[in-house]
Amino acid sequence: MNNVIPLQNSPERVSLLPIAPGVDFATALSLRRMATSTGATPAYLLAPEVSALLFYMPDQRHHMLFATLWNTGMRIGEARMLTPESFDLDGVRPFVRILSEKVRARRGRPPKDEVRLVPLTDISYVRQMESWMITTRPRRREPLWAVTDETMRNWLKQAVRRAEADGVHFSIPVTPHTFRHSYIMHMLYHRQPRKVIQALAGHRDPRSMEVYTRVFALDMAATLAVPFTGDGRDAAEILRTLPPLK
């Protein structure tokens, strides 16, 4: 497992990893370090980090679960309710139907406001999901991941341990919910409108997006290059020529 770039030990190569058009990994990593230093911004992974972490999930069932969290931003409880029937992979615009966790305790057809559709825009992920379903042949209404939340967390911990044993380290704690934060940040990096991301993530309150967008406020401030230091001697000479204030 030595063909993954160590994420902290090769700065020259790391800086070349793309995050989004016009954004490199080194810059995004520095911005994340600044944004999360106060604890106000949720911890998130960048795209190369997610790719590396998925690499250390050789079990396809584990891999496809976390690839699904990454590609959709859904909550872990929502993922547990997914069935093959939830996915539409054959059309021109593949998508997944996500049921609100509130639906779990009810029977019958869920209300419209408790179902959301999320486009699957990564064709590689769509092909992987198709292949996995063909191989495993689950029943159409059978949950794809009928396991406990704790089991899912253990799968993730195993992958993190494999990565660390191979010299790949992550600078933030990684949990299943990290993939949701990572999805939202990835969409923001790709300049998707806030209201669109809010709808896809299932956030009812627009203010919930503010914890993510403040990262880009820091980025904007950092790139303005506003100078504050001047030549004190020259300033004093200029001020000396002015009449005294009355």
UniProtKB/Swiss-Prot annotation:
| Matches recorded under InterPro entries | DNA_brk_join_enz, Integrase-like_cat_sf, Integrase_catalytic, Resolvase_Rsv, Tyrosine_recombinase_XerCD
Enumerate the Gene Ontology biological process terms: DNA integration; DNA recombination
Return the SUPFAM superfamilies for the record: DNA breaking-rejoining enzymes
**Quick check: keyword Repressor in the entry?**
yes
- Stretches assigned to the Tyr recombinase domain: 40-225
Instruction: Tell me the disulfide pairings in this chain.
Output: none
Q: Which domain of life is it from?
A: Bacteria
**What's in the keyword line of the UniProt record?**
DNA integration, DNA recombination, Plasmid, Repressor, Transcription, Transcription regulation
The record's Pfam families line, in alphabetical order, gives: Phage_integrase (PF00589)
Annotated catalytic residues: R75, K102, H177, R180, H203, Y212
Gene Ontology molecular functions: DNA binding
Q: Which PANTHER family match?
A: PHAGE INTEGRASE-RELATED (PTHR30349), TYROSINE RECOMBINASE XERD (PTHR30349:SF90)
Family of this protein: Belongs to the 'phage' integrase family.
Q: What is this protein called?
A: Probable site-specific recombinase
Q: Gene encoding this polypeptide?
A: intM
